[in-house]
Amino acid sequence: MKIIVRILILAEFAAIVFIPAAYLPRWALIPMFASMIGLVVLYWFAMFWVSRKDVEKVLGKAPEHDFYVGKLPADPSADLTRGRLCVTDGRLVLMQRTDDGERRQTPCREAWSRNVDEVTSVGFGKVLPARTGFILYYGDDEVRFTCAKAAKDKTIVYNALGWPVPETSEGN
């Protein structure tokens, strides 16, 4: 599916860029751009989206709390690890989408995990120059996640960790 979507995006881009304006009417450009944006969104879902149903299939039960995040890597030149952060049985587990060949057997895999008890504190704010999220602190270590939903409503992170929501916290 990803290959087909890539080819369609490339073909549509080539049509818009390389077909002379005399042969391509203006009214056709807007639907072409709209369908290209739709194809890019479809490609993103095919590459990164992990549904709650996929997580239930792999873990064998529904997670207590879950939300879609991007985990920042330790190496700044690497890409985000995108997936669904789940809290189940006292563990934080980041489930990442598997490749197409493996998807029928296991739609997602565990990319990162940690015990909830190890979290010493939580911080909210900008984790990248253009992205908000939250930071989980483990003593001297920290793990950063991008998640606009969690940055806006901090209670979901506190509830997921099983902590009381502070009165001074914004977004209650």
Please name every model-derived segment:
Residues I135-N159:
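Canonical phosphoinositide-binding patch of PH/PH-like domains
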Residues I19-A21, R109:
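Eukaryote-biased RCC1-like beta-propeller repeat architecture
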Residues M1-R6, F13-I16, P25-G90:
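Anionic N-terminal interaction surfaces
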Residues G60-E64, R114, K152:
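A general alpha-helical scaffold signature found inside nucleotide-binding enzyme cores
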Residues Y43, H65-P76, A151-T168:
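Eukaryotic phosphoinositide-binding membrane-targeting regions
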Residues G171-N172:
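Disordered regulatory linkers adjacent to lipid/PI-binding modules
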